[in-house]
Amino acid sequence: MNPDLNMNPHDSGRTDPYAPELGEIATDEGDGENVTKTGTTTVGLATEEGVVIATDRRASLGGRFVSNKNVVKVEEIHPTAAMTLVGSVGGAQSFIRTLRSEASLYETRRDEPMSINALATLAGNFARGGPFLAIHPILGGVDDEGSHVYTIDPAGGVMEDDYAVTGSGMQVAYGTIEGEYESDLSTEEAKELATNAVQAASERDTGSGNGLVIAEITDEGVEIEEFDDLADAL
C-alpha cells in the first residue's frame, strides 16, 4: 500500500499549495524548520440593526514578509450576508466563490434567499469536506430572524455568538471588545468598537495592519468601505 494515500494533508512533509496567507495556516515541517504562518484580524459584531464586520488589509508570506497592503478581506456572499477571508488566499477565495455560487443557486431555484443559519451550516459542511486549507472565516448576515455572527473553523465547526474574532490578532482584539461590548450597541457604536479592536491588534500583531475594511450588513444589503487610516473610520 502506498503510504502517501493515507497521509493527512496537514502533516509534515507536505508543501503548502496556497500563498500568501491571510490568516493562520498549517505548519510546514518538511525542511526541518517549523514556521507557523499567521496574519490578519477579522471582527464581527451583531446589533439589533444589523451586523458590522471589520478587518485589516495586510497579507503576508509566512507572517514575516508583507506581500500586499490593500487586501479586501470581506466579501458579499448573499444579498444580506458577508464573509471574511482568513487563511491562505487561494483557499479562502475558493471557499467564498463556492459558497456564493450555492447561495445564488438556492435563491434562483426557490425564489427566496437562503437563511443565514442554513448558509452557516452549508459553510461548515464545505469546510469539513472540501479542499479549503486552514480557513477560519467569520460569517455575518441578517434575515427574518434577526442579525447573526458565526465563526467557521477549519474542521467545519459552526458557532454563533453576539461577536467573534478570528486571525492571529484575535487575542488583542477580543480583549478590546470584551471590555466595551454591550448588547444594545447601535451600528455606529459597533463600527467604532470593531475599528478599535482591529487598531489594537494592528499595534501588536505583525500579521495585521495597513488600514481597515468595514462592512455594514442590514436587511437592505451589504455595504463595504475601505480606509487607509483607521482614524478616518471613527
UniProtKB/Swiss-Prot annotation:
GO annotation (BP), single: proteasomal protein catabolic process
InterPro entries membership: Ntn_hydrolases_N, Pept_T1A_Psome_bsu_arc, Pept_T1A_subB, Proteasome_sua/b, Proteasome_suB-type
UniProt signal peptide: none
Compartments where found: Cytoplasm
Propeptide residues, chain positions: 1-39
Protein family membership: Belongs to the peptidase T1B family.
Functional summary from the UniProt entry: Component of the proteasome core, a large protease complex with broad specificity involved in protein degradation.
Protein name stated in the entry: Proteasome subunit beta
Chain's gene name: psmB
